[in-house]
Structure formats: C-alpha cells, structure tokens
Regions:
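Extended amphipathic, helix-rich lipid-handling scaffolds
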Residues: 1-70, 82-84, 89-90, 94-177
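Short coil-to-beta strand junction motifs in C2/discoidin
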Residues: 78-79
Length: 177
C-alpha cells in the first residue's frame, strides 16, 4: 500500500475462481454480462492496482487456454492465450494463440478453427456503447492466411457497425461434401 494506492499480484489462478471472488463487487449489469460470457481458463499471472478504494482500478492478466461463449454480439472463443489489460473504461487484449476456435454466433454456418491467432484488440466504453479496434489481427489455418484491421461498434441501442478490412493469402477453395 502506498498512500491510497493498492497493488496485489497472484499466480496460477483460474478465471472461474477470480470471477467468484470479484462478482460481489460488480454491479448487476456487469455480473449478468460476465455470467452470459461464462469465461473459463487459466491465469498464470494477474495483477490488480486500485486508487481510492475500487473506484479506479487496472487489471493485467496473462491468459492461457481461456474460453467464453458468444454473447452480446461478440464471438465465442476457445483456447485464447495472451495478455489482457483493462480498467472500467477501456481495455486491450494482446493475442498470441494457437489452435483457437471462434464461434461467430450464427454469422457463419460453422465455427472457425485457427492454427494461429495473433494481434491486438482494444476496446473503449463510452455513453453510447462499446467500440473495439484492431490495427492488426493475423490468423492462419489450413484454408487461408489473413490479416485484418478495423473497428466494430456495439451500440447500447441499435445494430452493430463494422468497419473491417483485410488481406487474404494462401486461400484454399474447395467444394463442401
């Protein structure tokens, strides 16, 4: 403890255990959102910093094999590895994952399986909703290699807005049997 600042660190936690611990401090909206996401997986390292109680906080967590269901217009995922940093207003996920499954929640007929998923996704909450941005998200599997960038806006009311661009390489096109 330094003045009104606190810092805590932990190792080898599970996502489920951390959520059980923090859930009582979350408002009902956040509890419901996290419950529908149903996150699970391992947190080899996690750090929490606060100022003035928990009004202002920042979390940094190393992720390993993290999974969650698709919800609130966001895709589901399985086996994410990387670094997550967030505060009440914003966050960032630096991905460095292998053998990842992404469930697009009906946007595509089948989930997407990637041999590699690498890049950064940042988000920021404002009065109107949630905005996700990525300068580069690289993915590869046996059917293609691709690099994408852009933004997704998830308004509290109305339809999501996507502004995505990308390049495909090594695309394998075949007939579904």
């Amino acid at each position: 403890r330094a003045g009104e600042r606190w810092r805590g660190e932990g190792r080898d936690w599970r996502v489920q255990d951390v959520l059980a611990w923090v859930t009582p401090w979350l408002d009902e909206s956040a509890r419901n959102w996290l419950a529908s996401l149903d996150p699970r997986g391992d947190l080899p390292e996690i750090a929490l910093e606060t100022e003035s109680g928990f009004d202002t906080y920042a979390v940094t967590a190393r992720l390993h094999g993290v999974a969650g269901r698709s919800t609130h217009g966001l895709p589901g995922f399985d086996n994410l590895t990387g670094l997550l940093t967030f505060s009440p207003e914003r966050g960032q996920l630096e991905l460095d994952s292998q053998r990842v499954r992404v469930d697009t929640a009906g946007l595509l007929r089948l989930p997407l399986d990637f041999d590699r998923l690498h890049g950064t996704i940042a988000w920021q909450r404002d009065m109107d909703g949630l905005r996700l941005d990525s300068a580069s998200l690289e993915m590869a599997n046996s059917d293609f290699n691709g690099r994408f960038w852009g933004s997704v806006t998830l308004p509290d009311r109305g339809e999501p807005v996507l502004d995505l661009r990308g390049h495909y390489q090594d695309v394998r096109i075949g007939r579904e049997q």
